[in-house]
Amino acid sequence: MAASEQPQAGELLAKARRAFLEEFGAEPELAVSAPGRVNLIGEHTDYNRGLVLPMALELVTVLVGSPRVDGLVSLLTTSEDADEPRRLQFPLPTSQRPLEPGTPHWANYVKGVIQHYPAAPLPGFSAVVVSSVPLGGGLSSSASLEVATYTFLQQLCPDSGTIAARAQVCQRAEHSFAGVPCGIMDQLIALLGQRGHALLIDCRSLETSLVPLSDPKLAVLITNSNVRHSLGSSEYPLRRRQCEEVARALGKESLREVQLEELEAGRDLMSTEAFRRARHVVGEIQRTAQAAAALRRGDYRAFGRLMVESHHSLRDDYEVSCPELDQLVEAALSAPGVYGSRMTGGGFGGCTVTLLEASAAPRVMQHIQEQYHGTATFYLSQAADGAKVLHF
């Protein structure tokens, strides 16, 4: 069985150019791309100021466009999964008339970045968005679009901010325009990804370090359950609130400052459910540090064991898995050549990530599909680069 054939950035760029020419009657002047990501380990730790270990994917969002002089922004997306309408036009924000979220939802990510963009004056522009990052699959299509938008705006009106500041603008856009209180991991990896490396991110200090991930004998398999989720639903904000309440009860700024022994000792200060939520986060931060060390020394078995522990904790303590994800993980773990597998992303659907021997990939995909009650989509991806300006 083969992984889903994904268009390369060059093909997406050609598609975006054609769509732009058709829509606006001229060739676009500018083009940028930003990747989706998969988080290898460190789930629901980023908004708890913890550690995460994502890698950028070869799945990307491409944005092409040209400035215009009438102060309007005109957008088109070619994504069939995006909500209608697929095209819209609106004026640039002013201090008296800021942009506000609305419908279509896909455009809110673009609007949010425009609203919070720090440099001025920003001209109006026409743009087309083309993406190979699946929507709602837990591979961060939202941050991919935000970072592509930011990178595009930089070409129109250069900024002077740090990479961390750019990531924070994109994060703020998601908070205020999509209503998702996300951490900063997705935006940072979309900006900082480097081919052949995962990126260990400390979400407290925003320090990052590259972790080599280029062994040709190793493969990263992403399996989409094709069960869609919306993180704006009640569960994601509820988990975040529970974590903050536990940190407060223990007199800490965040769960990053909490050791497992302290959590156990303070068990009576919180509900059983809140304790389990915090136990996942505290344990996951430890697992992520251990996993990065295992990857650096090439100990894939140890890394795989930590992935499985992570999944069990997400399933049992954090309760963000679902039957489909559990089924995909169990199927992967019963196949020869697999080091480890876990759900990845926010949960309640979306994807699993599996570390395996590259030579075993076709057999493993076949095995998972045979065991899975639904229809899975597979992506094999190398660790890829972050956002970039493209040249025609």
Swiss-Prot record:
A Gene Ontology cellular-component term: cytosol
Gene3D superfamilies listed in its UniProt record: 3.30.230.10, GHMP kinase, C-terminal domain
Modified residues (Phosphoserine): 230
GO BP field: galactose metabolic process
Pfam families the UniProt entry points to: GalKase_gal_bdg, GHMP_kinases_C, GHMP_kinases_N
Reactions this protein catalyses: alpha-D-galactose + ATP = alpha-D-galactose 1-phosphate + ADP + H(+)
PROSITE patterns listed in its UniProt record: GALACTOKINASE, GHMP_KINASES_ATP
EC number(s) stated in the UniProt entry for this protein: 2.7.1.6
Annotated site, Transition state stabilizer, chain positions: 37
Residue numbers binding ATP: 136, 138, 140-141
Positions that bind alpha-D-galactose: 37, 43-44, 46, 186, 236
Active site (UniProt): 186
Keyword Disulfide bond recorded: no
Cited NCBIfam families: gal_kin
Name of this protein: Galactokinase
Organism in which the protein naturally occurs: Bos taurus
Gene: GALK1
